[in-house]
Amino acid sequence: NKKKLYALTQFYESGLFNHLQSLKNAKTVILFGSMVRSDWYSESDIDLFIYGDDDDFEIGKYELKLKREIQLFNAKNKKKLRKMGMGLVQNIIQGYFIKGTIDNLGVELKCLNS
């Protein structure tokens, strides 16, 4: 899909992917939403999920570079992930994994149902 490839190329060339991969205390980082589904348009935001600590994420820098708002969803621990709700979490895990794997969330996802 050309639209998806274009978006991913922009994120890579801006340095966003490298920056997200370098976040020391982020266990999992996932791009999801319209950018991954390829149904984005010029005003669409960028949906990102970070499991773990996102304190080092330079959100403003990349919003300026990409000329798009970044909608950040964060869960620092199991309790926060549980509060996000299963529907949102299912949407997130269908996204593009920038860092980590689904295994990083496996135990935590089971806890959502408990």
Give the label of every model feature segment:
Residues 1-27, 36-42, 51-114:
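Catalytic core of pol beta-like nucleotidyltransferases
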Residues 45-47:
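Acidic Asp/Glu-based divalent-cation binding sites
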